[in-house]
Amino acid sequence: QTGAQLYTVRSYTQTIEDFICTIQKIADIGYKAVQLSAVSKQIKPEQIREICDRADISIVLTHSDPERILHDTDALIKEHDILGCSYIGLGCMPDKYRTKEWLSHFISDFKEPAKKIAAAGKLFMYHNHNLEFETFAAENLPNAAPNRRILEYLLEGFAPDEMGVTLDTYWVAAAGADVCDWISQMSDRIPCVHLKDMKVKNWQPVMAPVMEGNLNFSAIFHALEASNCKYLLVE
């Protein structure tokens, strides 16, 4: 199913009036699903669910505050029950964990909430950027080696029922990695995928709408058909 990532229209989700209008416009385009990201905290889960239900829109994924995932897990799960949402997402690894000294702490810190989320019948989802393709010999983790990627440590540190990956096509490509290869490697871990293209402007890679850049989406879609992907979220 194709859905919309609301982060793209975050400027128009900061009041309940704007949120109602934005969801209706998304429904009018033909989308049947959304990911909640950067929506105003003043809009309550009950209100969000009611507005989306009226527009026949399902809420399939969120990006949630890492502190809430860590320290307010039970309440966060209940909010996702209200939203009718099974995937509780982390938008980005907090800065402090992104080193060889601290990566093991990310796995140990998020393991407990990930297990709680799984026990509630939901799944903790990790959204990649390009930073997860940095390589180093992580401290206090098994199979550490200088050429191992952060993403590989995460996949080893969390079981498939503890962590899924919201694979982002742009950011995989921005890391110089093969998007189709990583779809294949994580085929049982990617129920949600972010679709965005990449083009070049002034010698720099920049984000672009799908099919307006240089990524091979014909091959990407073919690879996704062989995976467990359920939701293609356009960003």
What is each residue range found by the language model?
Residues H71-H105, D109:
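Glycine/small-residue-rich loop that forms an oxyanion/phosphate-binding "nest" at active or ligand-binding sites
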Residues A4-T8, L36-A38, L61-P66, L90-C92, ...:
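A cross-domain feature marking catalytic cores of carbohydrate-active enzymes
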Residues A119-F217, F221:
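Acidic/histidine-rich catalytic cores of soluble enzymes
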Residues Q1-G3, A33-Q35, D56-L61, S86-G89, ...:
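Structural preference for beta-strand elements that scaffold enzyme active sites
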Residues I48-S64, F110-I117, E152-P160, F217:
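Alpha-helix-loop-beta-strand connector modules within alpha/beta enzyme cores
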Residues A4, I26, V34, C52, ...:
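Conserved, mostly hydrophobic/aromatic
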Residues Q1-Y87:
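N-terminal pre-domain/capping segments
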Residues R10-I16, Q35-E46, S64-T73, D95-S104, ...:
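Acidic-and-aromatic substrate-binding clefts and catalytic sites of carbohydrate-active enzymes
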